[in-house]
């Protein structure tokens, strides 16, 4: 939910960046990835409900994509705020940006998660 609010904020208050086609493309890409992640999550939950099987490599994939999407959003938020302003929003966005860097590490680095996926799906 927080990611959707961040997307809405960026669309509404992106200011001069909304004039930049590359920046809008990046914003659109993150939005599409977030929607795809939500749909995938719902599919996994539905399959678990129907079959009673515990999640497998799905959880690792969700963790990887989720952290990548969060990092992409915070990068866009950082670009959309004026770091020189020093206002509460700019400070909060900088803190969030730095905090999101660690999400690829906790709960197992994304590289470890990729190894888990390879082992579970390919039997490596």
Kindly give the residue locations of the regions a language model identified.
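Alpha-helical interface subdomain recognition
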Residues: 1-124
